[in-house]
């Protein structure tokens, strides 16, 4: 009989029952039309996971980059998409009442894989395994002090919210990407919410002696901003000192505070020695050209930056950036572009369809051969039967003539006796 899967009811299977004993038949043990249905189901499910992974990676990348720009309303950008969460499916053998919710970590969807996860409660904590076909690999096994608890799987772009009420041995299936392509939605429909401009404006003092220019390299976070302003504690200007160094000052008034100094004009913030060694303004910039002591360069919020499409170009550039994870490996270069990910999914499906078509053609040829072999032994040859009928007809006609001749002879004898 057909039974619902455990814990995923859509993952149906075939159960064999003999008396009081029951057992589940492995999906791979079926052939023919039934086996084709199961193979199609498994192939579609895997492809659905990959499309979900691609959808989440794209949406999160757009959200992250949009929040690094400025809108037409002189505001920092916000999310363009709403990333769906997924609820853990409890196994039927669970005895507790706990629940699990998986959420995509903002900015980390590029670390998502198309795989499902299994969470098992232990006596002291939880064990989390990643599922790859019939292979299960533990990726997290730690104690949990108390529940509810949140577990950060940064390497896989997820956070898991665990409620109280679980018993040791309880298990949950997590499918973070399975329905993502279907349930993902937009957070806004207003074109004005596209943050196409940079929130920073960089200018050179008109009294500078040199022709050196300043340009923005990148923005990685908006910790230096508050609403439509650049925080006073953030870098506001760079002054070339007498040694040719790049002194970085904040926006304190009336006296600016020296935050740090860089010795070269390339990636000034990354290479600067700040008074606070852990300080990171969340952006980087460079000054090109030969500078002169006393030159000043200003950093400010980009009010009314209507002719600035810096962040718009960054949004467009995401299509050629490596934003989708290739597999379960934690290697640094294990990423691909959105186009590559989509092409990979199409290629995978196309290869499987071609393989199944070949298998079907081979099975049809084998069936035809078997039918011909059977008919050659037990079947009827119409030509042979027609030949036999003609022969039987001729024999019948000959027999009829013999009978006729015998009857005539017998009649003649009777006439002679009379």
Regions found by a protein language model. Name each.
Residues 1-418:
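S/T-rich, low-complexity, solvent-exposed segments of bacterial secretion/appendage proteins
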């Amino acid at each position: 009989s057909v039974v619902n899967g455990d814990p995923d009811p859509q993952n149906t299977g075939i159960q064999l029952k003999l008396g009081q004993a029951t057992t589940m038949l492995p999906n791979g043990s079926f052939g023919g039309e039934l086996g084709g249905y199961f193979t199609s189901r498994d192939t579609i499910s895997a492809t659905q996971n990959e499309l979900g992974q691609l959808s989440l990676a794209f949406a999160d990348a757009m959200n992250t980059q949009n929040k690094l720009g400025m809108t037409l309303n002189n505001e920092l950008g916000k999310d363009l998409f709403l990333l769906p969460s997924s609820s853990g499916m409890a196994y039927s053998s669970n005895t507790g009442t706990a629940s699990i919710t998986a959420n995509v970590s903002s900015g980390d969807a590029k670390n998502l894989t198309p795989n499902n996860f299994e969470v098992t409660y232990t006596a002291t904590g939880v064990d989390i395994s990643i599922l790859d076909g019939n292979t299960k690999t533990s990726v997290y096994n730690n104690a949990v002090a108390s529940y509810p608890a949140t577990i950060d799987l940064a390497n896989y772009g997820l956070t898991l919210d665990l409620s109280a009420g679980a018993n040791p041995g309880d298990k949950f299936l997590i499918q973070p990407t399975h329905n993502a392509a279907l349930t993902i939605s937009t957070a806004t429909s207003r074109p004005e919410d596209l943050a196409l401009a940079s929130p920073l404006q960089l200018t050179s003092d008109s009294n500078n002696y040199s022709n050196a220019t300043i340009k923005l390299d990148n923005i990685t976070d908006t910790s230096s901003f508050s609403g439509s302003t650049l925080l006073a504690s953030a870098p506001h200007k760079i002054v070339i000192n007498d040694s040719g160094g790049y002194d970085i000052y904040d926006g304190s008034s009336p006296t600016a505070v020296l935050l740090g100094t860089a010795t070269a004009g390339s990636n000034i913030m990354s290479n600067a020695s700040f008074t606070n060694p852990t300080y990171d303004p969340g952006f980087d910039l460079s000054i090109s050209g030969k500078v002169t002591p006393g030159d000043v360069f200003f950093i400010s919020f980009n009010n009314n930056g209507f002719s600035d499409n810096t962040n718009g170009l960054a949004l467009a550039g995401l299509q050629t950036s490596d934003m989708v994870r290739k597999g379960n490996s934690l290697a640094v270069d294990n990423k691909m572009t959105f186009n590559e990910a989509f092409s990979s999914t199409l290629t995978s499906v196309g290869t499987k369809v071609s393989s199944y078509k070949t298998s079907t053609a081979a099975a049809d040829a084998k069936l035809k051969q078997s039918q011909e072999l059977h008919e050659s032994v037990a079947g009827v040859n119409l030509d042979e039967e027609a030949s036999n009928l003609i022969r039987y007809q001729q024999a019948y006609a000959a027999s009829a003539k013999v009978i006729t001749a015998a009857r005539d002879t017998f009649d003649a004898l009777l006439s002679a006796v009379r």
